[in-house]
Amino acid sequence: MLTFTSTSDAGTLAYVPRPMGERSPFVFVGERLWLDFVNSEFGIRRFDALRDFDSMVRWLEAAAVLDAERASGIRRRAQQQPAGAAASLIDARRVRAALRALAERGPLSDRVRFDGLGEINRVLGRSAGTRRVEQRADGTFIRSFVPVGDAFAGLVIPIVESAADALILGELSRVRRCADPRCQRVFFDNTKNGRRRWCDMSTCGNRAKAARHREKLKSH
């Protein structure tokens, strides 16, 4: 049986993706699991980090949704059921598109309905299974979910639960798009003044700073 883990902490929604190497295609700057999943497709040309099913499993592993052992189990099952794996990738991209629409529409009012709510509930409807708390080898604790039935269908459940939490807790007013138009990544603004502009100061923020410096030099 395969278990999916989530480091989301109810009430704060904080989660900690695993550190990635410099050459990793995965970037985690969204501060929320569902936003980082949206960011697996980014840029004006929409570079897709989920190129194939194995890429998706590696992303889930990097985001700490799957641990190494469980990721290996999913890969073995994908070899045995390639059609199911391919269908789950298509489904994950469909979910990602709905979550992007949610991230980009901003705060919702009582008079504005979110059309993607049906998509969220479609995935949550799969969530038959067992939830439990497990302790890692390093002593930390995680919540885990053991789905009943199709293991592929449960892969995106922790992601959609993260988005559902954001809706319930009214977090959409703090969701931003990176100010660099070439980036297109979204993030949760956890600053006190709510004025964060860049997904990451070390990349997009520094590029903007360098561009302003060049313009300043030209004007002198």
Regions found by a protein language model. Give the residues of each.
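Cys/His-clustered metal-coordination modules, chiefly Zn-binding fingers
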Residues: 142-220
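Short helix-coil boundary/hinge micro-motifs
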Residues: 1-176
